Amino acid sequence: MFSKNKISVGFAGLAKNVGKTTALISVLDNLRSLGKRIALTSIGYDGEEIDNITGLPKPKYFLKVGDLVATAQRCLVSGLRVVQETDVFTPLGRVLIARLERDTRVILAGPNKLRDLEKALTMFFSEGAEVALVDGSINRVYPLKLVDRFILSTGIARTGNLNRLKLEVEALNFFASLPVAEPSGNALEFIPSNIAPYKGQDLIFKEGVNFLLSEDLIGTYLKLKRHLLNGGKLGVINPLKISAITVSTFYPKPAKEGFEPAFMDIDLERELSFSKIPVIDVKRGRDGRRLAKIVLGSGG
């Protein structure tokens, strides 16, 4: 999207508590150890200290001197110096580009529209950032079509059924491998609820990221796979590009009072090794460094 030496990376999770923020923080820390100049923003607000459903602590973003952040005016904390102002507004005020003058925790409330995100990224790179990280979500996934790399997170908090998790990863590989199609006036925004009338026809979809909005990834996958078996063809004008899938064995376990943190004793990397998209558990060994190399386009 931008120049060769400027990389934008989006992160989203298929559910809450699947390690999206942990993956982003791991990438951030490893990129910093490689000497990269970093910028960070969020599609929407990300600043709660406690998960409003489970009551468990949420990972926090701590940035260092020289890092850049795009956040709303009311989220600015001491130690941030505004270097550029955008024309993007949120309920928490204008989105500002700021540079850290001391190490501090940051609260993010960034642009949530594609054009507004593009403005923030352009400003980041004009201020010298080499890698811009974007904390996104499945509910607001469309702006992430803008980024150069897309990291998708899933895990036991999404489903404790290993067979279902495998099928979902299989579905993600399927969606990401659909052939690129030429622009067409008949391109579909979303998958029809009833695909039978299209039997034997070519189905062209406009945006690959929209597959992730399906309430039933497996059902959608099986429906499209059946369409191929019935002689139809599939294509995507703007394909779904997933650079890596991060996985987490963490899940919030119901307790007497709310929830408590728990982990399933399973090697998800091994269980999902069939995936052509790299599957990474950033909590395991050196896999955080491996994910950072994928972000930079130098590993897999």
Spans of model-derived segments:
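Pre-Walker A adenine-sensing motif
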Residues: M1-S3
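Hydrophobic positions on the alpha1 helix immediately C-terminal to the Walker A/P-loop
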Residues: A23
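General beta-strand structural signal in soluble alpha/beta enzymes
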Residues: I38-I43, A109-G110, V131-G136, L152, ...
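Short hydrophobic/aromatic beta-strand immediately N-terminal to the Walker A/P-loop
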Residues: S8-A15
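Conserved glycine(s) of the Walker
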Residues: V18-G19
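Conserved catalytic-core segment of NTP-binding enzymes
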Residues: K113, L117-F274
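A cross-taxonomic marker for long C-terminal extensions/tails that follow the last structured domain
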Residues: S243, F274-G300
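N-terminal phosphate/diphosphate-binding loop that engages ATP/GTP or pyrophosphate donors
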Residues: V27-R99, G299
